[in-house]
């Protein structure tokens, strides 16, 4: 008999995620700014586009939750400015799992850090499986 896979790759509250190391190139960063329709002086100064933190939280969670996900909620906290081309380290924890209307949900608290370990962004994301 076939047993269905555990939701979210078996990740439960307390599951540690990462580290995931990633560099957002200047070209990719510019695409993020442009897709939002934003032309801001900090872009021309090389600043990373802060909402990219949401994508990094998704990539981090997908290292364990490999089935299709719906990204249902997001909260971002920006701690400081980061520069495009800088290696970022993303770590996190599944802080909550719950069921609502017959669907399983997971809340992930992810920290995006600069090479010196200082926090750049905190991303709190909620997911459900499709």
Regions found by a protein language model. Give the residues of each.
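Hot-dog-fold acyl-thioester-processing enzymes
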Residues: 1-73
């Amino acid at each position: 008999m076939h047993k269905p896979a555990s939701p979210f790759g078996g990740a439960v509250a307390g599951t540690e995620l990462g580290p995931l190391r990633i560099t957002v190139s200047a070209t990719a960063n510019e695409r993020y700014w442009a897709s939002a329709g934003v032309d801001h002086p900090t872009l021309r100064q090389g600043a990373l586009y802060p909402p990219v933190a949401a994508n990094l939280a998704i990539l981090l969670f997908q290292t364990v939750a490999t089935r299709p996900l719906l990204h249902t909620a997001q909260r971002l906290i920006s701690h400081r400015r980061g520069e495009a081309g800088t290696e970022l380290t993303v770590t996190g924890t599944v802080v909550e799992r719950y069921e609502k209307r017959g669907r399983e949900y997971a809340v992930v608290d992810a920290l995006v850090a600069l090479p010196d370990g200082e926090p750049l962004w905190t991303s709190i994301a909620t997911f459900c499986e499709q």
